[in-house]
């Protein structure tokens, strides 16, 4: 235990977290993904206090300033020094550029609104960190500061991914793409804590990051100052028309990448009633808008599904679920019906598709975003929205 470790008693939430970690099944040796923020810092501190053998692992994702850049590396190194644990840095900038930045730009150019965070978790963070920890340090587990919970279901033999206790900070939406193989080797120490609990516990440990401001949800926006600034750095302005669904021109834009489905504000269009973006036409470089009574969507098709808390169902399986179609949106009821994979999808890594029929029209069904299916707090699965109508 580090000499500078706190002697004051843990908060009730902190004490419960420590008890869970002390009784966690299996080996208590772990690499902690450290971004340099308060959440990952406390994750490492709690594991050390619970008696785990802990090593810090930071992925260097971008050059410049920010949580995933040099600033984050410095704070992460400082935390490891304070906790008296080893700190390792893996240069993942090329992988991040290839898997996330390039894919994001290509998506916006194609007229979709990509969700980089879930792909980053799967392709850049969790699986690569597990591989590095196992191969380089002989560590079978990783831990992160995500607000989500895990439970093993003895009946199904599957790990169930659950919402974090703090509804405002719950990050299960971004974790739907993690496989059972990954979930079996992951620990989420903050899953039962609220953000205020985290701040209090970080202060109790005297962590240098205890009062550090939160970064934006999207690290690229945080890195560039805004999402628009990020897009402007990669995509030159390309003027086009804003049109009604019948083709009537009602305005102009300087790039479809600056718009998303459901958007009402910032269109720069004067009309007799509010207009909403309903489609981005990349081929014609057009933003298609409609009044609210025309903007609702009753169903959508979801592809590249990853089944989490439930095994992949048979084609034409149907059940009611709660669906979340944006990170900050509330879940809504819908009927999920699985579909037979198309010939073009048959060889894909994740060929599963489904149709979602909503109880009431939805106004933010956005191709490229994730639709995540819930049963209560449990993530049943999720995939990427392909089409809507």
Swiss-Prot record:
Where, per UniProt, does this protein localize?
Cytoplasm
> What residues does the record give for site: Interaction with tRNA?
146, 369
Q: Which Pfam families match?
A: tRNA_Me_trans, tRNA_Me_trans_C, tRNA_Me_trans_M
* GO MF: ATP binding; tRNA binding; tRNA-uridine 2-sulfurtransferase activity
Catalytic site positions: 120, 219
Q: Output the GO biological process annotations, alphabetical, semicolon-separated.
A: tRNA wobble position uridine thiolation
Q: This protein is called what?
A: tRNA-specific 2-thiouridylase MnmA
């Amino acid at each position: 235990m580090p000499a500078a470790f706190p002697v004051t008693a843990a908060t009730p939430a902190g004490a419960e977290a420590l008890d869970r970690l002390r009784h966690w099944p299996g080996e208590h040796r772990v690499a902690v993904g450290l971004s340099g923020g308060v959440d990952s810092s406390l994750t490492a501190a709690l594991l050390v206090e619970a008696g785990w053998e802990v090593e810090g692992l930071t992925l260097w994702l971008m050059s410049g300033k920010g949580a995933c850049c040099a600033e984050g590396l410095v704070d992460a190194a400082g935390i490891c020094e304070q906790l008296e644990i080893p700190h390792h840095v893996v240069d993942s900038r090329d992988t991040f550029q290839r898997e996330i930045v390039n894919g994001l730009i290509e998506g916006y150019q194609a007229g979709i609104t990509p969700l980089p965070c879930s792909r980053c978790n799967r392709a850049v963070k969790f699986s690569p960190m597990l591989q590095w920890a196992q191969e380089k340090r002989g560590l079978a587990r990783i831990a992160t500061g995500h607000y989500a919970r895990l439970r093993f279901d003895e009946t199904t033999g599957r790990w169930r991914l659950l919402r974090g206790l703090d509804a405002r900070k719950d990050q299960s939406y971004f974790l739907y793409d993690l496989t059972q193989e990954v979930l079996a080797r992951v620990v989420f120490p903050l899953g039962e804590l609220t953000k205020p609990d985290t701040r209090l516990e970080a202060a109790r440990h005297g962590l240098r990051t205890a009062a550090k401001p939160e970064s934006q949800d999207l690290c690229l926006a945080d890195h560039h100052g805004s999402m628009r600034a990020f897009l402007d750095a990669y995509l030159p302005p390309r003027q086009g028309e804003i049109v009604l669904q019948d083709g009537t021109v009602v305005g102009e834009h300087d790039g479809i990448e600056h718009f998303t489905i459901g958007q009402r504000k910032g269109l720069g269009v004067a009309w007799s009633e509010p207009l909403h973006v309903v489609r981005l036409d990349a081929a014609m470089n057009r933003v298609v808008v409609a009044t609210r009574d025309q903007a609702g969507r009753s169903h959508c098709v979801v592809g590249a599904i990853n089944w989490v808390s439930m095994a992949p169902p048979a084609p034409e399986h149907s059940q009611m679920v709660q669906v979340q179609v944006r990170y900050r949106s509330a879940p809504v009821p819908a009927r999920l019906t699985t579909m037979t994979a198309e010939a073009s999808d048959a060889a894909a890594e994740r060929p599963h598709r489904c149709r979602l029929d909503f109880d009431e029209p939805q106004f933010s069904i956005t191709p490229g975003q994730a639709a995540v299916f819930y049963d209560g707090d449990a993530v049943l699965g999720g995939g990427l929205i392909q089409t809507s109508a």
